[in-house]
A protein has these predicted regions:
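N-terminal helix-loop segment corresponding to the beta1-alpha1 unit
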Residues: 1-119
Length: 119
């Protein structure tokens, strides 16, 4: 965990492209403790991604129930969830806002897309 104004804030980031990883990098720079969920089997992974600096990473197959449960256990202890998938993806994976907020009512569920949830 770093120092800074966000020290002590726990964030679960679902790996994506563009603004999501950049946002998480800035939050990490300000001291947030970030765990990035990478797709299992993806080439390279966050180890080689300069945009994933300052955070830990775990690779999971989110189509497997045990991986979804592992994510939910992380989410139970998180302050913020950040995702940037296409609309409906998190819901299909069983990780939509309704499910996550039942596990952690204080969670801030952040979505970041280029065209919103209906575009």
């Amino acid at each position: 965990m770093g120092s800074g104004p966000l020290s002590g804030i726990k964030i679960v980031e679902f790996a994506g492209i563009g603004p999501g990883p950049f946002c998480a990098s800035l939050l990490s720079d300000m001291g947030a403790d970030i765990v990035r969920i990478d797709r299992k089997g993806a080439k390279g992974g966050s180890k080689y991604d300069i945009g994933s600096r300052g955070r830990r990473s775990v690779a999971l197959d989110l189509k497997k129930p045990e991986s979804v449960e592992a994510c939910l256990k992380l989410i139970e202890k998180a302050d913020i969830l950040q995702e940037g998938f296409r609309p409906g993806v998190m819901e299909r994976l069983g990780l939509g806002p309704d499910v996550c907020l039942k596990r952690n009512p204080k969670l801030v569920y952040g979505r970041m897309t280029g065209w919103g949830q209906t575009g």
